[in-house]
Amino acid sequence: ENAKAHGVTQKEIAAVITHIAFYAGWPKGWAAFNLAKDVWSIDEGDLSYEDEAMRAHTKKMIFPIGEPNDKFAQYFTGKSFLAPVSTSQVGIFNVTFEPGCRNNWHIHHAKSGGGQILICIAGRGYYQEEGKEAVEMKPGDCVNIPAEVKHWHGAAPDEWFSHLAIEVPGEKTSSEWCEIVTDEIYGKLK
């Protein structure tokens, strides 16, 4: 409350806690997120979202939903939103999926290092590696994705989903977008 009283914004405290979590550990960072979420709660009047479910989802997290993810819309089934959290040193982005939204199968390539880390911050979603069963993600769940692993992630059919996507530094990194996740594959989620 003291930080808020001295002008620290919701976006600034989210960035601070994210950076600290890398040093203090995610369990401590997650506890701080939950405290900050209560202090920096979003007032009903602050929300410009027309969808009531989206408004309710927003209240569950400290990070902003961000803007419509138009740059990558061609790689998603459904609507997603993107909010940069950190773009220096390590790329960290809050990606929010509407119910039923998922990205295409894709691969994070790297000569060495690389890959991606996903941390669910609100809602419920799924992560799936090619050839394996989908893994449900709930707030606080973390998935480490090595480079060269074909995978997808997205929301549950009936719930909004937000995760932090953390770009693992590596040498000669790139992303390859592949085919869509079919309704048949998505329909098998439990």
Where are these regions (language model features)?
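A short, N-terminal "cap"/entry segment at the start of jelly-roll beta-barrel domains
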Residues: 54-93, 104, 174-190
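A short hydrophobic beta-strand segment most commonly corresponding to one strand
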Residues: 158-177
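Short, charged/polar surface micro-motifs in flexible loops or helix N-caps
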Residues: 88-90, 98-102, 124, 171
